[in-house]
Amino acid sequence: MSILDTAKAGNVLYEVGAYNLPTTHQTIERIYQDLLPHQEKFCKDIDHRKLALVCGFGAGKTYALCSKAVMLACMNIGHVSAVFQPTAPMLRDILIRTFNELLDQWQIPYTFRASPLPEYQLSWEEGTHTILLRTMLTYQRLRGQNLCAVGFDEADTIPKRDAESAMNMALARLRSGNVQQFYATTTPEGHGWAFETFEKNKKSDTALIQAKSSDNPFLPDTFIPSLYENYPPQLIKAYLLGQWVNLTSGQVYDRFSREDHVIDKIPFDTKMETLLCGVDFNVMNCNCVVGVRDGEKLVIIDEISKQKDTDALAQEIK
């Protein structure tokens, strides 16, 4: 018999006397100590089968996801759950790194297996729980698994159809344990999967929690002002305020305003002005806008469209 078979599990860096396995109750108390209000609301909700936390950059989405995963593990001793990231690099660089830091912080003994597929086994006085780590585009590998919980991080960054297929596969696996739940955290990426699932087509078993970047008081003082300085209004609404914004269709120039950029009458004679032409060359569909300078500004005075070739466009400009 190996000495390792008789030694109690623990971490040599823990405080004196902490070699005993923690109870699940102790772990849940430790997790709640550091949660922000929106994270706590997300972690406490075990009544909805589908749950999402949608918020701006830096609001603590991945922290909330890991907290939720461990709390559900505490409630499902002896069972298996899974957590997904969009890509393998994100799984390695974001999720695993965050899990390692938090498991040590919460003093949870664990073993990590990297191959053939990554997974954690967490240990408590009451027993163990296994968390599988996977990428969303490999969701087909869940076939045959009996899971108690499945979590998605940043699911809105993959195509809507793939995210929906992955979610449907996950929901079909939720058939073991004491608490079954599908949960997701993401930044809103337009009217994508998260909007369709948790807002537009929301069902009675579905809940949505939203938060702003500013709801995290621990962000650097320069973080939010810097984004306001560099982001256009549409991205500010999505990536700082956590709001649903159509980022992919509709008005091409979202900062265009007819009130600010359209005038009824040109305030000077343009006949002697140099014409500035912006041309889109195509076969059978040449287009052009014609403008003149007004000091530092450019005034567009005409538009020519659907000319068959360059010569026809030139004649029209003359």
Regions found by a protein language model. Give the residues of each.
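Pre-P-loop entry segment of helicase/translocase ATPase cores
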Residues: 1-50
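Walker A/P-loop NTP-binding motif
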Residues: 62-77
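Conserved RecA-like ASCE P-loop NTPase motor core of nucleic-acid helicases/translocases
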Residues: 79-91
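Inter-Walker segment of RecA-like/P-loop motor cores
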Residues: 90-148, 244
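Walker B catalytic acidic pair
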Residues: 153-157
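ASCE P-loop NTPase helicase motor core
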Residues: 159-230
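ATPase catalytic-site recognition across NTP-hydrolyzing enzymes
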Residues: 216-278, 284
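Nucleic-acid-processing active sites and adjacent nucleic-acid-binding tracks
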Residues: 271, 291-318
